[in-house]
Swiss-Prot record:
Location of this chain's protein in the cell: Cell membrane
Catalyzed reactions per annotation: (S)-dihydroorotate + a quinone = orotate + a quinol
Binding residue positions for FMN: 62-66, 86, 139, 172, 217, 245, 268, 297, 318-319
Name this protein carries in UniProt: Dihydroorotate dehydrogenase (quinone)
One cellular component term from this protein's GO annotations in UniProt: plasma membrane
Entry membrane topology: Peripheral membrane protein
Length: 336
């Protein structure tokens, strides 16, 4: 009820202004009696995945807390894991505004943010100060002005800087809002990137005395053959997990709705079916050799269960969380 009232107010604002205000409020409320508005005690539903123990299988997807400013608030909501980022080596402003749009009738969002963030060093400082009990994922990307042929260097820089502080590292090569980025999902480009990341992981594991798993985040807009090739690369390079999926460029489900023609990636309920299908195809190809984190359109316990039945060991929410609030996390965890 409280969240429904708050949402009514937030939805009167421009989508990005509402997001920024929410982040500020989470920072302001953290550690004060006001955090009772979102703090909740959830039952333990432990899951072993990628060599880590998650207190429950419901995580926050990357993109909501790009700079790691609200880890403690999301931890207090009971998430089993929180993924911050996407973060890049250098700060960047992202694409021009407006760049975030609600499709309220479809419970969807279109964004063309463009990896706006304050840089990896800023994020690391925030993580170092935060106190939390959930698993922390850090999602890394490349700067917009880094040529795609040099993209691996950006991922390696970020990986080196976040390694010590991450529970796992998510490699984002599937955002539709950085020109050319999705080309890294295919063929030799993917193989070379994963090989370099794996070598860096071995080097950093020895240096820090701990193994931090790597998960690749992929797009929903892939053919069956492309999914098969990605699976082959993941197994060949001993990557630890795969996150499926990012946002979609497809507008079929929302055609004719307000904002449907805005450029960017579509998330929320309209991507639910396709992302679940990608999870299913990944599971068919990978079996139990590699864990899958399912994300895309999870707005209820039923939607989360569908992802798990398709083969996901963990799930993440973002757009569903915007529309339904912390109660969504509670409902999923309690019903598992």
């Amino acid at each position: 009820m409280l969240y429904r009232l708050a949402r009514t107010g937030f939805f009167q604002l421009d989508a990005e202004k509402a997001h920024d205000l929410a982040i500020k409020n989470f920072q302001r409320f953290n550690g004060t009696p006001l955090d009772l508005f979102y703090r909740q005690q959830l039952p333990n539903r432990p899951v072993e995945c990628m060599g880590l123990t998650f207190r429950n299988p419901v995580g926050l997807a990357a993109g909501l807390d790009k700079n790691g400013e609200c880890i403690e608030a999301f931890d207090a909501m009971g998430f089993g894991f929180v993924e911050v980022g996407t973060v890049t080596p250098r700060p960047q402003p992202g694409n021009d505004k407006p760049r975030l749009f609600r499709l309220v009738e479809a419970e969807g969002i279109i964004n063309r943010m463009g990896f706006n963030n304050l840089g990896v060093d800023h994020l690391v400082e925030n993580v170092k100060k935060a106190k939390f009990n959930c698993v922390l994922g850090i999602n890394i990307g490349k700067n917009k002005d880094t040529p795609i042929e040099n993209g691996a260097e950006d991922y390696l820089i970020c990986m080196e800087k976040v390694y010590e502080y991450a529970g796992y590292i998510a490699v984002n090569i599937s955002s539709p809002n950085t020109p050319g980025l999705r080309s890294l999902q295919y063929g030799e480009a993917l193989d070379e990137l994963l090989s370099e990341l794996k070598a860096k992981q071995s080097e950093l594991a020895e240096k820090h005395g701990k193994y931090v798993p790597l998960a690749l985040k992929i797009a929903p807009d892939l053919s069956d053959d492309e999914i098969t090739q990605i699976c082959e690369s993941l197994l060949k390079n001993n990557i630890d997990g795969v996150i499926a999926t990012n946002t979609t460029l497809d507008r079929t489900v929302v055609e004719g709705m307000k904002h449907a023609n805005e450029a960017g990636g579509l998330s929320g309920r309209p991507v639910q079916s396709r992302s679940t299908e990608v999870v299913r195809k990944l599971h068919e190809a990978l079996g139990d050799k590699l864990p899958i984190i399912g994300v895309g359109g999870i707005d209820s316990y039923v939607a989360a269960k569908e992802k798990m039945m398709a083969g996901a060991q963990l799930v993440q929410v973002y757009t569903g969380f915007i529309y339904h609030g912390p109660g969504l996390v509670r409902d999923i965890v309690k019903n598992l």
